[in-house]
Amino acid sequence: TWDSRARLLDGLLENLLEFRSFRFIRLKAFVRPDMLVGPEIGRFPDASKVLTGAIDLSWPRAQLFGLLWQYLLNAPTAEGQPGFRELCKQVFHQRLGLHEGVWHGSDEMNTDEETQRSIFEVLAGEFMGSNRLRGYPYTWLPNHLADAYGQVSPRSFLAALREAAEDTDR
């Protein structure tokens, strides 16, 4: 039940507060933001000391696609097949960087949603079906993976794309 979860979460937060007194031990807890909402959370002395240190780990759409590009830029390619790096250079005229053995996309590729949309449309198609009635893959994917607060986790985003790619290969 929600009450038992709230008590467990309060216990976790109280432990985090206790460990603040140890100089060389810093605990971190990853908690879904929706679990921190409600009057029953943080009803113990000095709860605000723990709750005010919360950091938002949300991933906007541009960052999710930037993560996808990073993943694809560094993925191995099949023998004789052009990889994502070649596609970015030849088709999209993107300048890529190689730093310590890791490929990086351009700032435009990682932050500009129009550039990201055009790249993703080449990979996935312009429409979900044969026309726009079923939606556009660039917006459809994050919208359908989002939770009630509009948040998408990088793991579910990449997993959905991996599953779609494997399904396409079959």
Q: Which residues make up each language-model segment?
A:
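The catalytic "switch" region of P-loop NTPases
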Residues: 2-132
